[in-house]
Amino acid sequence: MLILGIESSCDETGVGIIELSDNGHMEIRADVVASSMEQHARFGGVVPEIASRAHLEAMPQVMKAALEEAGVEKPDAVAATVGPGLAGALLVGASAAKAFASAWGVPFYGVNHLGGHVAVANLEGEELPHSVALLVSGGHTQLLEVEAVGKPMKELGTTLDDAAGEAYDKVSRLLGLGYPGGPVIDKLAAQGKPTIDLPRGLSKAEDLRGPNRHNFSFSGLKTAVARHVEKAEREGTTVQVEDLCASFQEAVADVLTAKAVRACQDTGAKVLLLGGGVAANSRLRALAAKRCESAGIELRVPRFKLCTDNGVMIAAVAAQLIHEGAEPSGLACGTDTQLEVEVPLVAAR
């Protein structure tokens, strides 16, 4: 059975095709992604209207390329991200998916974007057991308890202000490094040393005992970087950009990995899964590996291409649901910018 997945929650237009065997095994047949990142760069972040228009323009070509890559004329089912995400962007992808499903006469499944980031774990090795997922991107920073792929997830913690990826972009803009901030800061950090003392949000003893035990905050860190730059300007000194990037990156990775490992210990999960665009960050991966090894926790990190938004992850979560006998969502299925993590599949109306 062939399942085609469409992802359009932010600035990537992704179409992926997965072949689902009767025993539940999944094989990637196509993975095509078009990004509108360059169009957003001049604005220093994603502009929703530009993202929506870019999806409209890219969808026909991306769809054609995916079908050609898989060597098929049509799939047996179509799935799309219906939330969470940007309203216009979600609407483009979901509408396209439903139109293709209707034209091909195949069922439509409306799935959760965050569930997709978790589902790619089943494509990388053994089936994901009870675990904690740390999903980190420009729009999300969440700790989720996962019983299994395709099942309702439980939010353990989230950011109370900026997402980690958003903090990277803002700091990059502050330092004049451009957009997106993640790759350039990661590169410069490798050339510097984390010698600048920067705050770790919600990491004090009282925070770790209270309701913010698993929550994050990056606004204070961002402000501290800004003050460091302002102080250098006042004093006429040179900002050591490489050291500042290394210090900022260390602070982010420190908090993310410490809280992720603690969440595993609190829930009894023996696996930590990293997902989202920031999961491609070299320091986050290295520190997560070190701390997981010390704590006796298995770390799973998707290959770089599957960390960022893509259609394969949407096809993967739909494939798991189909294998378990889930009913299609139907063409009346709507989108929800704030879709809860407890909803892996939007039910038929």
UniProtKB/Swiss-Prot annotation:
Residues that bind substrate: L135, V136, S137, G138, G139, D169, G182, D186, N281
PROSITE patterns according to UniProt: GLYCOPROTEASE
GO molecular function (one): N(6)-L-threonylcarbamoyladenine synthase activity
Subcellular location: Cytoplasm
Gene Ontology biological process terms, A to Z: tRNA threonylcarbamoyladenosine modification
UniProt entry keywords in alphabetical sequence: Acyltransferase, Cytoplasm, Iron, Metal-binding, Transferase, tRNA processing
Any Pfam family: TsaD
EC annotation from Swiss-Prot or TrEMBL: 2.3.1.234
Presence of the UniProt keyword Manganese in the record: no
InterPro entries: ATPase_NBD, Gcp-like_dom, KAE1/TsaD, Peptidase_M22_CS, TsaD
Keyword Manganese attributed: no
GO CC entries: cytoplasm
Cofactor(s) essential for the protein: Fe(2+)
Catalytic reactions of this protein: L-threonylcarbamoyladenylate + adenosine(37) in tRNA = N(6)-L-threonylcarbamoyladenosine(37) in tRNA + AMP + H(+)
Function: Required for the formation of a threonylcarbamoyl group on adenosine at position 37 (t(6)A37) in tRNAs that read codons beginning with adenine. Is involved in the transfer of the threonylcarbamoyl moiety of threonylcarbamoyl-AMP (TC-AMP) to the N6 group of A37, together with TsaE and TsaB. TsaD likely plays a direct catalytic role in this reaction.
PANTHER family according to UniProt: TRNA N6-ADENOSINE THREONYLCARBAMOYLTRANSFERASE (PTHR11735), TRNA N6-ADENOSINE THREONYLCARBAMOYLTRANSFERASE, MITOCHONDRIAL (PTHR11735:SF6)
Alphabetical list of HAMAP family matching this protein: TsaD
Family: Belongs to the KAE1 / TsaD family.
This protein's name: tRNA N6-adenosine threonylcarbamoyltransferase
Organism encoding this protein: Corynebacterium aurimucosum (strain ATCC 700975 / DSM 44827 / CIP 107346 / CN-1) (Corynebacterium nigricans)
